[in-house]
Amino acid sequence: MSSSLTPAIDQLVRCLRYLPGVGAKTATRMALNLLERDQGRAADLAIAISDALTRVKRCSRCQNFCEAELCSICESPKRDDRVLCVVESPTDVLAIEQTSDYSGRYFVLMGHLSPIDGIGPEDIGVDKLKQLLQESAVSELILATNPTVEGEATAHFIAHIAKDLNIPVSRIAHGIPLGGELGMIDSGTLSHALQGRKPFA
């Protein structure tokens, strides 16, 4: 007995599997739910995806997603031009903005260095970042790439560029999450936490 329903449903399931964290079973449930119960919402979803693909582009300054030449953060006169935070994705910008602890500007790499995957500096906009650093009044560069092998390699690569331009570089701290228990923390995270310790006030 075939596990397929129709070619159109199979195609929908394949496309839904492109979403992060969505496997075959979840994609199948989502597809069938859209077709069984929420056809109106499914049509709205299709329109919203098409609309986003048409209207959303990259900010000409920071590479974040926007619908104009500049994103709202780059347009804002209230942001501190002296501080630039480098992140891997627009999701990281949203996460930092939700803390309300940062008032500087951003540069979104849209990825990280990964030679094994053929992703080099030019693929993530490092040349554009260097030009921005040369032309702006940045006095601190914050590296907020992910604490992965690729994220660390990307941070080191960008740090060398900034240091050549005499721009001070800092790295966001990595360590134990608030409410976490030491016995449940992996050794790599615990090592970062110990190395990044600071005086207790």
Curated annotation (Swiss-Prot):
A zinc finger (C4-type) spans 59-74. Signal peptide: none annotated. InterPro entries: DNA_Rcmb_RecR (IPR000093), Rcmb_RecR (IPR023627), Rcmb_RecR_Znf (IPR015967), TOPRIM_dom (IPR006171), TOPRIM_RecR (IPR034137). PROSITE patterns: RECR, TOPRIM. Keywords: DNA damage, DNA recombination, DNA repair, Metal-binding, Zinc, Zinc-finger. Residues 82-177 form the Toprim domain. One of its GO terms (biological process) is DNA recombination. It comes from the Bacteria. PANTHER family: RECOMBINATION PROTEIN RECR. Belongs to the RecR family. This is Recombination protein RecR. It comes from Hahella chejuensis (strain KCTC 2396). The lineage of its organism: Bacteria, Pseudomonadati, Pseudomonadota, Gammaproteobacteria, Oceanospirillales. The gene is recR.
